[in-house]
Amino acid sequence: MDGYSSKKPRSASPSRSSLTEVEEEERDTLLKTVSLEEEDKSGENGPRKLRRSRFLYAIGILMLSNIAFIAAFLTVFVQKRALEPARLPPWAPPERYESRVFKYMDVYGGEPGPKSEEAWTNLIPKGKGWIKVHNETAIPDMPGLDQSLPEQSALVSVFHQLHCLYMTRAGYFAARSGNLDEVNVVHVSHCWDYLRQAIMCHSDTTLEWLHAPPDNFGSTGWGYEHQCRDYEAIFAFATEHRAGERQVIHG
C-alpha cells in the first residue's frame, strides 16, 4: 500500500439531485414572481371592473326608469283621451254633461192649464228645435239630403221627443174629457214608438234602490242623481242656429 486513500476524488460538476433542487427553487421563485405580477395586475383591474359594473348598473336603471316613465305617460294620455268627449263638427249640438236629481214637478205632471201650458212651451226654443246648417262644412250624406243646397235644415231630436211627450199628454187629457175627436191617433201612435226607441237608445242605467219596508213596493224614481246632457247648452245652441222664430210645442 502506498498510504494513500482509496476514495475517488469529487467531481467538479453538481449531481443530478442537487440540480433538481436548484431547478425547483428557481421554478418556485419564478412562479412567485408571476403570481405577484398577476396580483398587481388584478389589483389594478379591480377598481376598473368595479367602476364599469357601476356604470352599466346605472345605465340599466336609467333605461328602466325611462321605460316606466313612457309607459305611465302613455297610460295617462290614453285615459285622458278616453274621458274627453269626441270632437264634434261645428254644426253639431254640444255634448256637455251635468248631474241632475230627479224630483216631481206638478207644473208638468198636473192637470192642463195656462201655467202648465206655458211651462211646457218654454221647454222648446224659438224655431221649434229646427236649426240651419250651412254646407260650408262636411255634412253626412243622409237619405233624402240634397247636398247641392247652400244650407240644410235639421231638427234636434230632444225637442222632437219633448213634442211627442206633450202630444201624448194632450191626447190623454182630451180622451179623459171625452173629446176623442181631438186625439190624433196616428200622431200619438208614432210618438209612443218614437219615445220608446229614444228611451232605449239613451238607456239611463242609474240604479233606483228599493226602499225598506213598508215602502218596498217599487220606485217612484224621485231623489236619484243622474248624469245628464246639459239641456240649457243644447237649448242655447238651437236658439242661436234656429231656422225660424215660432216657439210652440204642439203642431
From Swiss-Prot:
UstYa family oxidase; part of the gene cluster that mediates the biosynthesis of the phomopsins, a group of hexapeptide mycotoxins which infects lupins and causes lupinosis disease in livestock. Within the pathway, phomYb is probably involved in the construction of the macrocyclic structure of the phomopsins. The pathway starts with the processing of the precursor phomA by several endopeptidases including kexin proteases as well as the cluster-specific S41 family peptidase phomP1 and the oligopeptidase phomG to produce 10 identical copies of the hexapeptide Tyr-Val-Ile-Pro-Ile-Asp. Residues 1-47 are annotated as: Disordered. The chain crosses the membrane at residues 58-78. Keywords: Glycoprotein, Membrane, Oxidoreductase, Transmembrane, Transmembrane helix, Virulence. One of its GO terms (molecular function) is oxidoreductase activity. Its EC number is 1.-.-.-. It comes from Diaporthe leptostromiformis (Lupinosis disease fungus). A motif (HXXHC 1) lies at residues 160-164. Disruption phenotype: Abolishes the formation of phomopsin A and related metabolites. Belongs to the ustYa family. Its main location: membrane. Pathway: Mycotoxin biosynthesis. GO terms for cellular component: membrane. It holds the Pfam family UstYa. Glycans are attached at N135. The 2 HXXHC motifs are conserved in ustYa family proteins and might form active sites. One of its GO terms (biological process) is mycotoxin biosynthetic process. The keyword Transmembrane helix applies. A motif (HXXHC 2) lies at residues 187-191. This is UstYa family oxidase phomYb. It is found in: Membrane. The keyword Nucleus does not apply.
